[in-house]
Amino acid sequence: MQQHLKYKIMTNIKHLAIIMDGNARWADQHNLTKSEGHKAGADKIRELLPEFINLNIPYITLYTFSSENWQRSSTEVDFLIKLLSIYFKNELNSLHKNGVKIKVIGRLNLLSSSLQKQINNAIELTKNNNKITLCIAFSYGSRQEIVDACTKIIASGKKEISESDIGHALYDPEMPDVDLLIRPGGVYRISNFLLWQAAYAELYFSPKYWPAFNKDDIIEAINDYSKRKRTFGKR
């Protein structure tokens, strides 16, 4: 009964965003390589996605690779890009079978043509699924997204820009505002992630590294969220 109650609470959350932080530090802690840490982080998606589905969360966004991550070593960057490709290769059929709609946001033009094709194929295959939307933020930065949106609006010939114009010009105009943003890893910042969409999001930080995060940690974050009063600037 208690577990059912916890799940019922979750129906209030329409969009859960997660900064998947701490892969490398988790690897150091376990005497593993950074690559092994990132792989463990990717495996965690496979583990937790069924829980998100059971919790009836309509929209999940995962921050997997930021625009600033391009400045890391070429070895690490190449592995992270390869990991995304492997994820789609290994998981796409299962995701599709389970009703998951795939979206990918970011400056995808910086990726190889083969990976862009793989991403587009995943989006096309799953576009009519409606159980849950899994949005992967890759080569993504929120400031860059807002700049790209404004550039797009200006190119359309508009002289004045409204909030609505920007919202419709973002990478995913259908993305709902973030209700709860979770960041594991013991770091207390949002690192250029969904700044527009998370304007009124509740923030939850955990000292646990992402590869160590589990279902109970998600439930704990949800229960914490359920106790908060969201005023959206009102009284």
Curated annotation (Swiss-Prot):
GO biological process per UniProt? polyprenol biosynthetic process
Q: Which Gene3D superfamilies match?
A: Decaprenyl diphosphate synthase-like
Q: Does the keyword Glycoprotein apply?
A: no
Root EC class: transferase
What is the required cofactor set for this protein? Mg(2+)
The highest taxon in the source lineage is Bacteria
Q: Which HAMAP family match?
A: ISPT (MF_01139)
* Name assigned to this protein: Isoprenyl transferase
Species this chain originates from: Rickettsia felis (strain ATCC VR-1525 / URRWXCal2) (Rickettsia azadi)
> What gene name is given for the protein in this entry?
uppS
